[in-house]
C-alpha cells in the first residue's frame, strides 16, 4: 500500500522524579464537636420571645380621616426575625401578624373560575395543601382575621382562568 514505510515512532515522555507536590496530599482539619443537645422543640421556635420586635408591630387603624381605609394593608414581604442565643445563627420567617377580628383585603385573589364545593354560594378559603406554605389570605384566616378578596380582572385578550379557549 504505502512504499514509504510506517510512521516514525514518537519518543516517550520522560518520567518525572517524585518531588514535593504543589498541593498537600491530605488536609488536616480539626474534627467538629459532636452535638450534645437535642434540637429545639417545634413549640419553642414559635414562642413570642423569638419574634423580632420590628416584625410584631401592627399599623394602627383610624377612621377619623375622610377616605381612610378601614382595612389593614396586606404585608407584601415576609419579615425575618433572628432567634435567641440558644439556637445557632439561623433565621426563620415570621409571617404578618393580624389582630383577631380585623379585616384584611387581598386584591386580585378571587378567581372567578374557582369552585369551593358543590353548590357553594359563600366563599371559603381552603387550607394549604400538605407541604405547601399558606398564602396571605390563609395566614390571615388562621390568625382570626376576616378576609375580603377582590376579583381578579380578566378580559377577552388576556384570557380567564376558567379553562376556555380563544379561537383566532
UniProtKB/Swiss-Prot annotation:
Positions of disulphide bridges: none
Statement: the UniProt record of this protein carries the keyword Transferase: no
Entry comment on modification after translation: Ubiquitinated by SMURF2, leading to proteasomal degradation. Ubiquitinated by NEDD4, leading to proteasomal degradation.
InterPro entries: DAZ_assoc-2 (IPR022730)
Positions of short motif PPAY: 39-42
Domain of life: Eukaryota
GO terms of molecular function: DNA-binding transcription factor binding; identical protein binding; mitogen-activated protein kinase kinase kinase binding; p53 binding; protein serine/threonine kinase activator activity; protein serine/threonine kinase binding; receptor tyrosine kinase binding; ubiquitin protein ligase binding
In-chain residues carrying the UniProt-annotated modification Phosphoserine: 77
BP terms from Gene Ontology: positive regulation of RNA polymerase II regulatory region sequence-specific DNA binding; protein destabilization; stress granule assembly
Region listing for Disordered, in residue ranges: 1-25
Localization (cell): Cytoplasm; Nucleus; Nucleus speckle; Nucleus, Nuclear body
The keyword Plastid appears for this protein: no
Predominant location category: cytoplasm
Ranges annotated as biased composition (Low complexity): 1-13
Function of the protein: In unstressed cells, promotes SIAH1-mediated polyubiquitination and degradation of the serine/threonine-protein kinase HIPK2, probably by acting as a loading factor that potentiates complex formation between HIPK2 and ubiquitin ligase SIAH1. In response to DNA damage, localizes to the nucleus following phosphorylation by HIPK2 and modulates the expression of a subset of TP53/p53 target genes by binding to TP53 at target gene promoters. This limits the expression of a number of cell death-mediating TP53 target genes, reducing DNA damage-induced cell death.
Subunit structure as annotated in this protein's UniProt entry: Interacts with SOX6. Interacts with DAZ1 and DAZL. Interacts with IL17RB. May interact with FAM168B. Interacts with INCA1. Interacts with EIF4G1 and EIF4G2. Interacts (via PPAY motif) with NEDD4 (via WW domains). Interacts with transcription factor TCF4; the interaction results in localization of DAZAP2 to the nucleus. Interacts with transcription factors TCF7 and TCF7L1. Interacts with transcription factor LEF1.
Protein name per its UniProtKB record: DAZ-associated protein 2
Lineage, highest ranks first: Eukaryota, Metazoa, Chordata, Craniata, Vertebrata
Amino acid at each position: 500500500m504505502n512504499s514509504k514505510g510506517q510512521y516514525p515512532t514518537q519518543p516517550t515522555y520522560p518520567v518525572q522524579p517524585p518531588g514535593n507536590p504543589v498541593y498537600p496530599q491530605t488536609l488536616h482539619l480539626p474534627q467538629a464537636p459532636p452535638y450534645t443537645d437535642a434540637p429545639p422543640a417545634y413549640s419553642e421556635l414559635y414562642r413570642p420571645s423569638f419574634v423580632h420586635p420590628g416584625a410584631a408591630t401592627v399599623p394602627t387603624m383610624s377612621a377619623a380621616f375622610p377616605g381612610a381605609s378601614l382595612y389593614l394593608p396586606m404585608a407584601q414581604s415576609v419579615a425575618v426575625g433572628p432567634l435567641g442565643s440558644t439556637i445557632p445563627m439561623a433565621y426563620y420567617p415570621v409571617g404578618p401578624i393580624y389582630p383577631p377580628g380585623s379585616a384584611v383585603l387581598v386584591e386580585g385573589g378571587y378567581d372567578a373560575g374557582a369552585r369551593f364545593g358543590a353548590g357553594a354560594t359563600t366563599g371559603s378559603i381552603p387550607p394549604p395543601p400538605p407541604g405547601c406554605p399558606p398564602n396571605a389570605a390563609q395566614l390571615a384566616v388562621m390568625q382570626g382575621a376576616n378576609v375580603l378578596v377582590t376579583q381578579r380582572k380578566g378580559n377577552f385578550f388576556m384570557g380567564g382562568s376558567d379553562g376556555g379557549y380563544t379561537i383566532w
